Every structure is written in C-alpha cells, then in structure tokens.
From Swiss-Prot:
Belongs to the universal ribosomal protein uL13 family. One of its GO terms (cellular component) is cytosolic large ribosomal subunit. Pfam families: Ribosomal_L13 (PF00572). The keyword Aminoacyl-tRNA synthetase does not apply. This protein is one of the early assembly proteins of the 50S ribosomal subunit, although it is not seen to bind rRNA by itself. It is important during the early stages of 50S assembly. Part of the 50S ribosomal subunit. SUPFAM superfamilies: Ribosomal protein L13. It comes from the Bacteria. Gene3D superfamilies: Ribosomal protein L13. Disulfide bonds: none annotated. GO terms for biological process: negative regulation of translation; translation. GO terms for molecular function: mRNA binding; structural constituent of ribosome. This is Large ribosomal subunit protein uL13.
Amino acid sequence: MNKTITPSLETIERNWFLVDAKDKTLGRLATEIATVLRGKNKPTYTPHLDTGDFVIVVNAEKVEVTGKKASQKLYRRHSGRPGGMKIEKFESLQERIPERIIEQAVKGMLPHNSLGRQQFKKLKVYKGADHPHAAQNPVLLNS
C-alpha cells in the first residue's frame, strides 16, 4: 500500500508568474489565475495547504468582457451605514480602479475561508505595464 506524502510548508517551492491582461476575457483570465494561486497546476497540490504561486497581473485596464457586460455588469459595495449601498457599472469602475475588477473576479473563485484569504495575498494586480517585482524574475504564464 502506498503512502500519500503531504508536502511540508518548508518544501513548497513558490514561483512568480506574470500575466498580461491586455485583450483577455475577464472570466477566462480569472480562472487561470485562481488555479495557479491555489496550486492546482502542481503535482504537490494539497487542498488544505497553500501550495500556490505568486501571480503578477499587468495591463488590468485593458481586460475585456463579452456581450453587453461592459455597460450592464454591476459592482456593489456597502459602507456599513444605513443607505450606504453604492452601485457602479463595469465601465466606470474600469476607468476609476481597474485593478479591483480582476481582484474581485479572482477572489470569488478562491475558497471563502482563511486559506482563500492567504492565497489571495499572493495576487498582485497593476493598472499599467510596469510592476515593482522585477527582482523576483517572474515567468510569463502561458495563457
């Protein structure tokens, strides 16, 4: 009988990947990113451990959606105060804070617990083509 080997946190190797969001569909891009953040692309994947890699996303303002979602998709947030619900369309949020669009799409695809919050911290999203992580030597993610 074979024994299942659970990787220890010291043996997990974390790589850095770079993703260019220019002209990519939002949902398809988010699923690829979430898979890498969770570590499901590795043979050492373990559901209860954070085995994922770091992901850097550039050109967040150039991500696309299909159909009429650009004018119809709504993003909601609440201040916590009575009557504090704010509703914003995709187009206006893309002009104001384009990073938040990708962050919310990926966050919804990660586990909704402390492990998911830990994995989400490894996502770095930037508006333009520049990022401050050149020292990590990120590898371009095949997408």
